[in-house]
């Protein structure tokens, strides 16, 4: 559905309406630039992109530890994005522009800097995939300051929807906690239920995102991510897809200078 976002978002902007657009903002950097151009003409930020992980409590705690600075700078971030399965319509490109795009935006937000280069590594493929699909893949990214990020995208793992993240600092490592609220310990062992979908895992984040946007609109204010964030994520996606199609070659992320409007 990403291909239909740009025309509708631009119509909302032209009507002077706030809009919460599901990711991606658009499927091409050119369409993102068109959106930003239309928005800047209004002189007002109107577009929020639906990157809901910015509203997840655990990710926010992780960011607070980093921003506090007690444990030094970020050095590495390890991510795992695992799905139990995907439909046959899911493509290898979607592993990047529909799945990894969540980590792409979250890493930009968490670290407070842009991703400047990316490559795609291809491990041994799972036998659980459809024949047309490359799965799993590992998206390897580097930020402007040199933080190295890896993201395992593994969408046919069968057992659960599992989102994992570990932030490695100079004197500490910060990891997202377990997905469920309780563990059961009995004669059969120590266990907890596993999420089976993104709604299971991020229901509270979705609700927080929507309520934050509704409240902001009521105050005639912008909240959350901007069109620039949508554009930046799409630029990283474009470079990653280039790498996927070029045997994993390292690709530079090409972006315009950030307009003062989005500073």
Regions found by a protein language model. Give the residues of each.
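Beta-loop-alpha module in the N-terminal Rossmann-like domain of NAD(P)-dependent dehydrogenases
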Residues: 1-38
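Hydrophobic residues in well-ordered beta-strands that form the structural core
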Residues: 21, 27, 47-49, 78, ...
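Rossmann-fold dehydrogenase core element
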Residues: 33-52, 72-78
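C-terminal helix-rich "cap/oligomerization" subdomain common to oxidoreductases
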Residues: 33, 215-263
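Rossmann-like dinucleotide-binding domain that binds NAD(P)(H)
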Residues: 86-160, 228
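Rossmann-like NAD(P)H-binding beta-loop-alpha module
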Residues: 57-79
């Amino acid at each position: 559905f990403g291909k239909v976002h740009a025309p509708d978002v631009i119509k909302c902007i032209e009507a002077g309406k706030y809009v919460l657009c599901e990711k991606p903002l658009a499927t091409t950097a050119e369409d993102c630039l068109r959106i930003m151009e239309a928005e800047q003409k209004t002189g007002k930020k109107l577009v929020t992109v639906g990157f809901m992980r910015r509203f997840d409590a655990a990710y926010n705690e992780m960011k607070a530890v980093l921003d506090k600075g007690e444990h030094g700078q970020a050095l590495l971030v390890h991510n795992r994005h695992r799905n139990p399965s995907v439909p046959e319509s899911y493509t290898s490109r979607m592993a990047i522009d529909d799945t990894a795009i969540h980590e792409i935006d979250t890493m930009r937000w968490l670290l407070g800097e842009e991703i400047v280069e990316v490559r795609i590594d291809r491990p041994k493929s799972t036998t659980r995939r459809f024949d047309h699909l490359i799965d799993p893949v590992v998206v390897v990214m580097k930020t402007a300051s040199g933080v190295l990020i890896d993201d395992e995208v593994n969408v046919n793992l069968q057992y659960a929807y599992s989102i994992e993240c570990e932030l490695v600092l100079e004197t500490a490592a910060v990891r997202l906690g377990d997905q469920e609220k309780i563990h059961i310990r009995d004669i059969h062992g120590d266990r907890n239920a596993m999420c089976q979908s993104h709604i299971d895992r991020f229901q509270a984040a979705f609700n927080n995102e929507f309520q934050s946007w509704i409240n902001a609109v009521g105050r005639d204010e912008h909240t959350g991510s901007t069109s620039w964030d949508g554009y930046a994520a799409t630029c990283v996606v474009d470079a990653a897809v280039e790498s996927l199609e070029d045997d994993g070659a390292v690709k530079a992320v090409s972006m315009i200078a950030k307009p003062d409007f989005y500073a």
